[in-house]
Structure formats: C-alpha cells, structure tokens
Amino acid sequence: MYSFEQAITQLFQQLSLSIPDTIEPVIGVKVGEFACHITEHPVGQILMFTLPSLDNNNEKETLLSHNIFSQDILKPILSWDEVGGHPVLWNRQPLNNLDNNSLYTQLEMLVQGAERLQTSSLISPPRSFS
C-alpha cells in the first residue's frame, strides 16, 4: 500500500515536476488551464478535484448528464459545493489500488472531464422518455 506522500512523489516524477520538499495535505498541479488539487480524503483514498469555470448558459440538467454510471471507477463526478454553490469536478481511488499509472490516469481523466464540461453548452440535454 502506498502512502499519500509516496503517491504524490510518484505522480510528480511521472509529470516530470520537481518533488516538493514538504508535501502539504492538499497539493496543487496545473494541467493546461486547469488547477487540479490532490489530497487524501477520506483516509486511504486519493481525491483529485478541480473547479471548472462553466458558462452561465449551461443548465445543471445538461451538466449532470455527465454523471451517468460508468464501469470506470476513475470517471469524474460533477457536484456543487455546499457553501458557494460552485461546480466541483472530482474523482478518487483507494491508495491500496494504486499501480504505476493509475494516478496519472486519474489526473488525465479529471482534466478530460473538465474539458468536456467546458464544451457542454454544445451538447444537447438528454432526451426524456415517457
């Protein structure tokens, strides 16, 4: 089983970033235009999240269509924070499930999800069935 510090060290090595001298409880990584945050929450889970900036024309129903079930446990989930009502895109995985590529894949899927959300105004809402 990896520790949070070992997981962050491995991810930074894969991203060719300098490893911080002190690994804080929440680590930030900039990927393209997205600030991605990584923490251990709850204990034993690697949580990654970003705060996507969404166009005001996006309706929550359309955005929530991205939350459809998936076989991939790393697929990001869109939520709204309780305090400010801002969108939060997040995913997580158990520390004991990590392998050499799973953190990189988790970060990649988070960024891809954020990119899709920014273009969601081009996506029509799901059809309703009667």
Curated annotation (Swiss-Prot):
GO terms for biological process: protein secretion by the type III secretion system. Keywords: Activator, Plasmid, Transcription, Transcription regulation, Virulence. The keyword Transcription regulation applies. Gene3D superfamilies: 3.30.1460.10. It holds the Pfam family CesT. Positive regulator of YopE. This is YopE regulator. It comes from Yersinia enterocolitica serotype O:8 / biotype 1B (strain NCTC 13174 / 8081). The gene is yerA.
